[in-house]
Each structure stands twice: as structure tokens, then as C-alpha cells.
Amino acid sequence: MLTRTRVRQGHGPLRLRQDLQRAGVEATAALEIDWLQQAQAVCQKRFGDTPPTDARDYARRARFLAGRGFTGETIRRVLGAGRERDFSAD
């Protein structure tokens, strides 16, 4: 029940694992959750469909997703791998 609640709230695998440990529940690796899809939905709900406009916006979105407990790899895939380099010319 805690797992489903946290996923519905938009939390990622790292945050979920931490919450389960804090509650004294054994974390199961067999959760059938598509974390990439979950992160995309959370990001879209918060920021809409538009991609990051500059490095600052990219960083803001990345911090938001990291705070929700998503892994760095998932965050890069959601925001577009290599996009942070595209903004370096700004």
C-alpha cells in the first residue's frame, strides 16, 4: 500500500526505497513499474510538454526530478540526453 501511494504521488525508486526502509519494510526489487514513464508523467504534470529552454530550466527540472527520487540516468533520458550541452553556447 505504501508503495502504490508513493508512486501515485510521483515519487521515484530512490525515494520509495528510502521511505520503505524508514518504515521498516523490506524493499522489493521486483516492482513492475516503468520508472521512465513515471518520471515523464511527473515532469509533464509539473512543467508541461515544452522541453527545457535553457541550462537554468534544464537544471531546475533535473533538481525537481532528483528531489522526487528518480535516478540520474532516468532524469537524463526524460530531459533529453545531452541537452545540457546544447545550452552551453547560451
Curated annotation (Swiss-Prot):
GO terms under cellular component: cytoplasm
Matching Pfam families: RecX_HTH2, RecX_HTH3
Keyword Manganese: no
Annotated compartments: Cytoplasm
Functional summary from the UniProt entry: Modulates RecA activity.
Family matches, as InterPro entries: RecX_HTH_2nd, RecX_HTH_3rd, WH-like_DNA-bd_sf
Keyword vocabulary terms for this entry: Cytoplasm
Name listed for the protein in its UniProt record: Regulatory protein RecX
Keyword Cytoplasm: yes
Family affiliation: Belongs to the RecX family.
